[in-house]
């Protein structure tokens, strides 16, 4: 991983990512900041289950990654590290760490399987995926999103896999 990408991954904040403009399996990543917050707090297994399941369903579906996936992985890894540190004294943290290991295993298997596919060339920098040309519109318009999905999503799904494998070798 190059130093620019490493620094970006280490310093980017949830609020720096335009989640409402990133695709997921079922729409946009608008709810991700709140879901990351629930996971970070580790207050209850029930709350962690709901937030974690929603994130998992939206970053990977049928071995496909979405535009939000590589960015979500940054924050899930940070949450995992915190859960590991707190797992001895917090049963929710212990549970969350186990669940994240399962999710990371699924992600790693998708990466392994995806390496056999053809990929778009990766962008020079990880954060280039947030360039305006790759983002969905600021305003939600379901009809416009459907049209854009049909035209551009194949590239973004394949590019997200290429970015994860090129820039984020720390995830597997």
Give residue spans per PLM region:
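Residue-level detector of extended alpha-helical repeat arrays and alpha-solenoid scaffolds
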Residues: 48-49, 69, 73, 90-93, ...
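Alpha-helical solenoid scaffolds in eukaryotic proteins
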Residues: 30-38, 71-79, 166-171
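Acidic, serine/threonine- and proline-enriched intrinsically disordered linkers and terminal tails
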Residues: 94, 101-171
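Residue-level signature of the C-terminal ends
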Residues: 58-62, 79, 83, 106-114
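Helix-loop junctions that connect tandem helical modules in alpha-solenoid scaffolds
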Residues: 36-43, 79-91, 171-172
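HEAT-repeat alpha-solenoid elements in large eukaryotic scaffold proteins
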Residues: 45-57, 104
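N-terminal "cap/leader" segments of large eukaryotic alpha-helical scaffolds
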Residues: 1-48
């Amino acid at each position: 991983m190059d130093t620019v990408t490493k620094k970006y991954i280490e310093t980017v904040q949830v609020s720096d990512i335009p989640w409402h403009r990133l695709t997921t399996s079922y729409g946009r990543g608008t709810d991700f900041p709140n879901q990351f917050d629930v996971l970070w707090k580790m207050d209850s297994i029930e709350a962690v289950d709901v937030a974690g399941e929603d994130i998992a369903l939206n970053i990977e579906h049928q071995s496909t990654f979405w535009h939000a996936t590589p960015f979500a992985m940054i924050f899930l890894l940070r949450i995992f590290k915190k859960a590991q540190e707190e797992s001895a004294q917090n049963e929710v943290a212990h549970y969350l760490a186990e669940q994240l290991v399962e999710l990371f295993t699924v992600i790693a298997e998708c990466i392994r399987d995806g390496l056999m596919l053809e990929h778009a060339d990766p962008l020079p920098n990880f954060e280039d995926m947030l360039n305006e040309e790759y983002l969905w519109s600021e305003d939600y318009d379901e009809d416009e999103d459907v049209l854009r999905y049909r035209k551009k999503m194949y590239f973004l799904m394949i590019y997200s896999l290429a970015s994860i494998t090129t820039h984020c070798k720390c995830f597997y």
